[in-house]
Amino acid sequence: MESFMESLNRLKEIHEKEVLGLQNKLLELNSERCRDAQRIEELFSKNHQLREQQKTLKENLRVLENRLRAGLCDRCMVTQELARKRQQEFESSHLQNLQRIFILTNEMNGLKEENETLKEEVKRLRGLGDRPKPRAKEGTSDPPSPLLLPSPGGWKAITEKPPGGHEEAEEDHQGVGLRGEEKPAGHRTSPVAKISPGATLPESRAPDMSPQRISNQLHGTIAVVRPGSQACPADRGPANGTPPPLPARSSPPSPAYERGLSLDSFLRASRPSAMTHEAPKLSPKVDRLCLLNRPLSLHLQSPHSSPLAPAAAPSDPRLQDLKAREAEAWEEPTELLGLPSALAGMQDLRLEGALHLLLAQQQLRARARAGSVRPRGQPTPGEMLPSLPVGSDSEGPENEGTRAALAAAGLSGGRHTQPAGPGRAQRTEAAATQDCALDKPLDLSEWGRARGQDTPKPAGQHGSLSPAAAHTASPEPPTQSGPLTRSPQALSNGTKGTRVPEQEEASTPMDPSRPLPGSQLSLSSPGSTEDEDTGRPLPPPHPQPPPHPQPPDLDGHPEPSKAEVLRPESDELDETDTPGSEVGLSSQAEATTSTTGEGPECICTQEHGQGPPRKRKRASEPGDKASKKPSRGRRKLTATEGPGSPRDAEDHSPSPNSSPWEET
């Protein structure tokens, strides 16, 4: 029993021990299981994360693969972006520049248009300013001589004008050659015609009034330039726009010139443009005449020869004698050159004419000073009053000094150097005005030369110039007459031309054979110019006295017609010419020409028959002859006064012209 009990107890103890041991193992297994579960969870989470990462990586891989397939890397993308930005900036700046350029271009075009409009306005204003001035003078002054020399300012405007002026002259000359005598009368009308009260200035004439054209018209035959310049006016294309200085005797222009109406503008309105047609053909012939330029200009610029010196009054015989000797000394170099000494005298006279013409602009002031002038020159009231409108004889001491110097210089041959007293000064002025009634270019043609020697000087033609005669001063191509140089009386051109009305009035008592100035006033009808151009003879508005043979110069030389002086230049052309061609416009209807060798003839150098060929023969009208030849008529009167009178000096200046030019 005890043994069994003991055995049972033992068994229970062993069973409990075993159970405890198994429980411990179970607990250990459970713990391990829990740990494994945790690990599994951790691994699962990790696995999940890894899968997600794998997905992202795959996506990245795809993107990279796509980029590789596109061929652009990150750098390329950046570079491309930068390039795009730069291109955009460049394009924007370019557009801005284009806009600015467009704006500036528009502004420039606007400025150009405005400039053009301003230029047109200036031209129009100048035209308006130039036109009224000659018209204003119409009422107060008699028609000036057809050959008016420009004032010093005018000379500058003329010579400095661009070469275009010369080209225009050539074109006009060609036009004259083609149209012949059919050229519009407006181009042939002399300035007298334009200036006369009856005449009107056509608007279309504005382009024809360039200073170059005027210079060609006035100086195509005789070049009056500065001592240094060698180009003749015909050759000279002044560089529209600005003119060469006046070489003439007007060294210091008196204030009267400045205050007076500008001769340049006056000439623009009064000068026919056609006168410039001479320029192309005259240039070779004018070259010879240019040889006189230096001595002339040097003489003119000498302190003694200044016409404006107030001290030189015509009443002082010593001044007259001194200037006459100076003129002689100055004349010698030209004779050494083989050129006629008379030509220099002609230039002096022409310059004198220019000075008087400039003074003519002072007519109103001249009237005011007329009282002061009379004591000096002692001119009769009859002479003074006619000259006042022209302002030629009444300008005061300056003008008289000028005339004294010019008269003395006019003694180109030095043949008459006697001083002129106050009485002689009066006669000299009258003679100068008559001689230059119509300034006419000299005819250098052979026939003109021969005719000039034999021709009588029509005393009455001076005043009786028909408008045709005045207009024949219009340029005609020098084909037949060559460059037409004016005789000394003709050269006194402007001055004497301005005196012309005065002289005609004053000289009518002196020279009965000379018609009244009224006949010369008729020079300016435009209609007459048309008749001239068409070649139809114009009946002289006033009866023209028959040409009266003038007594030969005191030297015994008949005064050469202007044609004579021009003869050498146009020998070839003149052979074809017939005396008939010389018929003056006024005497055109009368046909006052005779054979060249017949002896004294009325050489009406201006002929419509020649038409354009005698472009320069503005003065080539019997009136111009009158200016020269009537001077001979006046010389008759003055010869009685005294062979040494200033008139003789002026009258004799042309006589040298005939022989020297014939020799040349």
From Swiss-Prot:
Skewed-composition ranges (Pro residues): 241-255, 537-552
Location of region: Disordered: 125-284, 369-664
Pfam families: CtIP_N (PF10482)
Ranges annotated as biased composition (Low complexity): 516-528
Top-level taxon: Eukaryota
Annotated Gene Ontology cellular component terms: extracellular space
UniProt biased composition (Polar residues): 481-496, 584-597, 654-664
Transmembrane regions listed in the UniProt entry: none
Compositional bias ranges of the Basic residues kind: 628-637
Comp. bias (Basic and acidic residues): 125-140, 437-454, 554-570
Descriptive protein name: RBBP8 N-terminal-like protein
Originating species: Homo sapiens
Underlying gene: RBBP8NL
